[in-house]
């Protein structure tokens, strides 16, 4: 995924609580985080909205201009809007009811690999969710403070798709 350019549908609209329109252009910033969440299974568990609010507050307190693009593919829009409202999530989200983002980008099926650190050109620099993994969060914060990927050491999260599985010898 590293270096892959994320494609945005022509009409991408972000709104508060999934209903009050805020903006429809992708922010131009050195870094941005894109997180895609489909609502199969426990949407609230995947989203962890209170943790995202804490992370956003941390970025703001550090005066880091890093937009976070929440792309939500709801199974039930009303339920997802209720979750946003219940958690007082006052940050814009894109309700992708037609799953256009996934159709254009073919995101990995594992939700742990559906959050991406993007550069100004929407190319993937890293993959991983900073609210689900403390080490990812620390890595992202280092990136934002340094401004580049040069000289990074330590563990990095990668994903590789392998379409063949060796089942051994069958008798």
Task: Label each PLM-derived region with a short phrase.
Residues 41, 46-86, 100-103:
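Structural microenvironment flanking redox-active thiols in thiol-disulfide oxidoreductases
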Residues 81-114:
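Short, internal strand/loop/helix patches
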Residues 1-26, 47:
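N-terminal "domain-start" segment that seeds a small globular fold
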Residues 112, 117-171:
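Thiol-/selenol-based redox modules, centered on thioredoxin-like
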Residues 78-91, 155-167:
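Short, compositionally biased leader-like segments
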Residues 35, 68-71, 117:
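Structural beta-sheet core signal
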Residues 19-54:
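Short active-site neighborhood of thiol/selenol oxidoreductases, capturing the structured segment around
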Residues 28, 63-65, 110:
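Extracytoplasmic
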């Amino acid at each position: 995924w590293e270096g892959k350019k994320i494609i945005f549908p022509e009409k991408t609209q972000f709104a508060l609580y999934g209903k009050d329109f805020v903006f429809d252009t992708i922010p131009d910033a050195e870094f941005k985080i894109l997180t895609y969440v489909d609502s199969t299974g426990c949407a609230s568990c995947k989203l962890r909205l209170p943790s995202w609010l804490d992370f956003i507050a941390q970025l703001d307190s550090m005066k880091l201009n890093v937009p976070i693009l929440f792309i939500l593919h709801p199974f039930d829009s009303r339920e997802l809007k209720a979750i946003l409202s219940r958690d007082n999530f006052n940050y814009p989200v894109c309700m992708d009811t037609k799953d256009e983002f996934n159709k254009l980008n073919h995101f990995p099926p594992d939700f742990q690999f559906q959050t991406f650190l993007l550069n100004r050109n929407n190319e993937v620099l890293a993959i991983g969710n900073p609210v689900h993994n403390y080490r990812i969060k620390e890595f992202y914060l280092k990136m934002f403070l340094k401004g580049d990927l040069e000289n990074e050491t330590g563990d990095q999260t990668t994903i590789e798709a392998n379409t063949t599985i060796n089942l051994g010898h069958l008798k």
